[in-house]
Amino acid sequence: MRSCTAAPGVSRTNTHARRGLGVAYRWAVSKTTRAQSGRLSSRFWRLLGATTEKNQNRSLAQVTASAEFDKEAADLNDEKLRKAAGLLNLEDLADSADIPQFLAIAREAGERATGLRPFDVQLLGALRMLAGDVIEMATGEGKTLAGAIAAAGYALGGRHVHVVTINDYLARRDAEWMAPLLEAMDLTVGWITAESTGADRRAAYECDVTYASVNEIGFDVLRDQLVTDVADLVSPNPDVALIDEADSVLVDEALVPLVLAGTTHRETPRLEIIKLVAQLVKDKDADEYFATDADSRNVHLTEAGARKVEKALGGIDLYSEEHVGTTLTEVNVALHAHVLLQRDVHYIVRDDAVHLINASRGRIAQLQRWPDGLQAAVEAKEGIETTETGEVLDTITVQALINRYVTVCGMTGTALAAGEQLRQFYKLGVSPIPPNTPNIREDESDRVYITAAAKNDAIVEHIAEVHDTGQPVLVGTRDVAESEDLHERLLRRDIPAVVLNAKNDAEEAAVIAEAGTLSRVTVSTQMAGRGTDIRLGGSDEADHDQVAELGGLHVVGTGRHHTQRLDNQLRGRAGRQGDPGSSVFFSSWEDDVVAANLDGNKLPMETDEDGQIVSAKAAGLLDHAQRVAEGRMLDVHANTWRYNQLIAQQRAIIVDRRNTLLRTATAREELADLAPKRYKELSETVSEHRLEKICRMIMLYHLDRGWADHLAYLADIRESIHLRALGRQNPLDEFHRMAVDAFASLAADAIEAAQQTFETANVLEDEPGLDLSKLARPTSTWTYMVNDNPLSDDTLSTLSLPGVFR
């Protein structure tokens, strides 16, 4: 973690104290003029509304006005530049007259500190983030610098800013890269990774600007709910969240629960069930025992399969009240593991462990695991020792985590396509930012084939043809298995290709940096979130002109994703900052997005001599399939949000109660009222300070115990709530009713249990106090993310898996 150091001679405290005393260095504001260059096309404004156009025009005018102050900023030495930044009045960003001066200072500080002089479009992007929007900036247009300038604007106004990244690598890289810029404006910078100690984290969060991954921030929030002393709090302050790759964090991973678990003595899932299902699946008559739906996303026992399982388990009735919520659930989970989850598609096996693949990023989800029974079932399927499950002590979804912040803004290359989700679930606007240099990338229409086999043959031929010219090719595949199959095909054609997939993600930055090298062929799984620019001619741009002459980077997509955003992220790798480039997608009527969303009987089948569909409607049909898939994703998000929202509200109540107990004398006062005789007895031998600590530990323990039990109860409900639909009950309504009823007595039960402990705990003989050894907290804790959608694709498709509301 970078230490938080203020600029020499100007302490952080003094800087903020001076901000309300007037602006000694404030320059006169000249009459602003409307910016004429880089105007956005009218179709964006029709989409986003007149209010957005008005706000964007104001920001454009402020960027133009900032040029009037560039010379004054350039004439200031480093010390005066820091002082000028500290004296700006940016507390009310909406009405501040100092915005043009701030932009001039930021531009000058950027050039001095990093060698990067921000373009007008980067300043515009920063202003739209300061207005609370998510901006869409194309790949290579400088989002990192724009984000740092926006963070500086918030911090100079007295706000604490968390720049939220998608992984630790980017958090550290961007913090170290942008720290000189922020420090040049008298701001402190910190960063956090999984290796950061508690002291490192506290120091980083005390900085004006803190860079950290969404996982680490979430885990810090969860761990703070276990401490029994204020001094142990890491205390991330939820003030401003500036989110990089905002669509990935706020949409793709919005529903992912972050989990804090601890050691427990509860039983692990029964291996006999998992082994029984494995035998069932391998049986020569397996087709008689279970059935899958048309798109292989749900599986269930047939009547014959149920009878066979019941017989193997001693003649039980799977659908009886005794077994329907337990044994049947375990059977269904094991079926999903063996029938639907595919190795090298949904997960990989490395170092004797199962690693999930993040579908939206195409990389290993290092901290993710499936809901406990499914994780164990997959491990057993692969012959791997099942990992310790533990007990869930606390959990929070990414969406609930981000909604804690007072202000949320962000940046991504594909915000418009996620605009509806951003508006509906976060009340965020979207501001498209024009490129600094016009995009000249050429995007071909899809090449569509009847079968996947014909498509794959055509892809190899196309890559070979382009490779013969020396033009670099970047191929984006849907999953690991596809990338490795394509790689093998290319090698058989004597085409040397580099593979970047979830199996070698540690090398991804170096691999991607060289994808623009002359004659290079790079095969990669989903490109979202890579965070590394692809420069023509390689990372050193040695052959830039030669590659540009050949047409720049050529991007090949091996199939449409279920959302246009991911297609655009792949296309956006070509045509960086005005460079030439091109893209083409190959699709087939057998692709997932088509099979799940279009009627196969109504698809055109006429082909040319190369097997390519000749109908002009083909690309339009693919677009329609994507729109259907995106609509389903929005419905699923909304439905799942309704389940998670109640838990988030209940958690907020617990957090508020816990903070009261932790930071005040409430625990001592309440137990004194509830057990006055015991309190009087103890107060005669125990100091008030120690007695307060004892009372706090007792009350916190029972509150935490009650919350963990409540979460376990909710998990049990989720495993069988879908069965309520069979009785014509609304599962959501039933879940809410049961969750509310259970929560109603949680606080009172915790207080009652605390009173009993206070009155019955033995008095210590060797020192004043109570023996609290029975209030045993977990001997170890760990954090992870739950992949609550095991067949994760970009639609979050409906599943029958118990415990998943889809």
Curated annotation (Swiss-Prot):
An example Gene Ontology biological process: protein import
Classification via InterPro entries: Helicase_ATP-bd, Helicase_C-like, P-loop_NTPase, SecA, SecA_Actinobact-type, SecA_CS, SecA_DEAD, SecA_motor_DEAD
Tagged with keyword Secreted: no
GO CC term, one of those recorded: plasma membrane
UniProt keywords, alphabetically: ATP-binding, Cell membrane, Cytoplasm, Membrane, Nucleotide-binding, Protein transport, Translocase, Translocation, Transport
GO molecular function: ATP binding; protein-exporting ATPase activity
Pfam families for this protein: P-loop_SecA, SecA_DEAD, SecA_PP_bind, SecA_SW
Residues reported in the UniProt entry to bind ATP: Q122, G140, E141, G142, K143, T144, D533
Top EC group: translocase
CDD domains per the UniProt record, alphabetical: DEXDc_SecA, SF2_C_secA
Catalytic activity: ATP + H2O + cellular proteinSide 1 = ADP + phosphate + cellular proteinSide 2
SMART domains xrefs: SecA_DEAD, SecA_PP_bind
Lipid bilayer topology: Peripheral membrane protein
Localization (cell): Cell membrane; Cytoplasm
EC number, UniProt record: 7.4.2.8
Family note: Belongs to the SecA family.
Subunit structure: Monomer and homodimer. Part of the essential Sec protein translocation apparatus which comprises SecA, SecYEG and auxiliary proteins SecDF. Other proteins may also be involved.
Function: Part of the Sec protein translocase complex. Interacts with the SecYEG preprotein conducting channel. Has a central role in coupling the hydrolysis of ATP to the transfer of proteins into and across the cell membrane, serving as an ATP-driven molecular motor driving the stepwise translocation of polypeptide chains across the membrane.
Protein name: Protein translocase subunit SecA 2
Gene: secA2
